[in-house]
Amino acid sequence: MTVPVNATNLRIPLDTGRDREFLDSWAELEAIGATPAGGVERQAGTAEDGQMRDWLSRWLRTRGFSVEVDPIGNLFGLLEFNPGAPYVLVGSHLDSQPRGGRFDGAYGVLAGAVAADRTRRYVTRSGFTPRYNVAVVDWFNEEGSRFKPSMMGSAVFTGTLDLEEALNTTDDDGVSVRDALAAINGIGDREVFSSTGPRQLAAYAEIHIEQGRELEKNNVTIGLVDRTWAANKYELNVVGIQGHTGATAIEDRQDALLGAALIVVALRDIADEFGEELHTSCGQLTVLPNSPVVVPREVHMHLDLRSDNDELLAAADAALRRRIAEAEIRAGVKVEHRKAHVWPGHHYQPQGVELARDAANDLGISSMLVQTRAGHDSTNMKEIVPSVMLFVPSVEGISHAEAEYTSDEDLCSGVDLLTEVVARMLDGSLDAAGAGHP
């Protein structure tokens, strides 16, 4: 079987064994860090993350890729077809949430690697030289569960996060990113790509599970991501006074956990008030001293607000700040705003969306426009190079959980489409698209 003729000269034959080859590799990859309930545990910089990276490095090297790592731990597999030409970069991330899903991120890395390798095989057989080279990437610490913020590797790569600040970031046990990467031999000594160096980028592509239900509800195989939601993420410290849960009178308590609980309830109230255009969450609470007979003196909490409407997001932010002030009075506590990370919502380049739509139509794969409410590394990358973001369906929309699932059929269809998208990008189909948002 051969993909239909497209607007480029690069056509990637799809042989009948292509799905089996991908699925066999996928079975090896998803077994690393596997949990009894069908998920995975491989947070950034852990031994399991190191095992994933080692597996990927071996897979790439045996297929002729050169493997390099940059100073923040992003791992690249490079294929040079046209010496001196820029690269099309494709990939995602290998790290996971605690007891997370096995498809989130890792699918996109392997799919990108397979797409690049299929291109290599075609170039070797045909003698055709693409306009650009191709590289695969595993972005370090996309999830942000062990080290904050999320999308750390791509943020450093795109210049929105300082390298030293990222390397000095510590987890809850005081281990720094620098030390965690060193422990898994995952830190490089020089940049792999640079806007002024010998290696530059032409475009970026990423495929990911949807982590929602739009594709499933519409019985569609591929989501063409045209916009990312904005996100405001906050770290708060709620500070009270430690006391005895039995002896301290209720009216005398300055209960940090009560203050935090009021803020959590406020988040849900705000979501209900603003409707489906706003998502609010509190995903992590650290309670001190966390004793059953002690009124908590301090709670560290992580919150986020997300929306595709900037005005609505600003209004929700103002509402949250009012409710925080009310919680301070009600609980007799002080709330310290430690840090905030803000990601604006922007459109992906329309030329990339159309390229992917045309490729899906040519392959006979159903597609539809979708937005991403979750952050992805392409959120950062689209600001510096033309970028394409694709989704495959998530059964029941479950993600960041061990029950996360995408069918083999949808996984393989996604790899086929990504292969064709990368082929068209390698032949310059996005040359007219600029970086940033329209």
UniProtKB/Swiss-Prot annotation:
Q: Which InterPro entries did the record assign?
A: Amidase_Cbmase, Bact_exopeptidase_dim_dom, Peptidase_M20
Its Enzyme Commission number(s) read 3.5.-.-
- Residues annotated as binding Zn(2+) 1 are 95, 104, 208
Q: Which Pfam families match?
A: Peptidase_M20
User: Cofactor: bound how, per the entry note?
Assistant: Binds 2 Zn(2+) ions per subunit.
Single GO molecular-function term? Answer: hydrolase activity, acting on carbon-nitrogen (but not peptide) bonds, in linear amidines
If you read the UniProt record, what top EC class would you report for this enzyme, in one word? hydrolase
Which positions hold the covalent cross-link Isoglutamyl lysine isopeptide (Lys-Gln) (interchain with Q-Cter in protein Pup)?
A: 217
User: Which co-factor is required?
Assistant: Zn(2+)
Signal sequence interval, chain numbering: none
Q: Does the keyword Chloroplast apply?
A: no
Q: Where does Zn(2+) 2 bind?
A: 104, 143, 400
Give the domain of life.
Bacteria
Q: Which Gene3D superfamilies match?
A: 3.30.70.360, Zn peptidases
Has keyword Ubl conjugation?
yes
Q: Which UniProt keywords apply?
A: Hydrolase, Isopeptide bond, Metal-binding, Ubl conjugation, Zinc
Q: Which family, according to UniProt?
A: Belongs to the peptidase M20 family.
Q: What is this protein called?
A: Putative hydrolase MSMEG_3995/MSMEI_3903
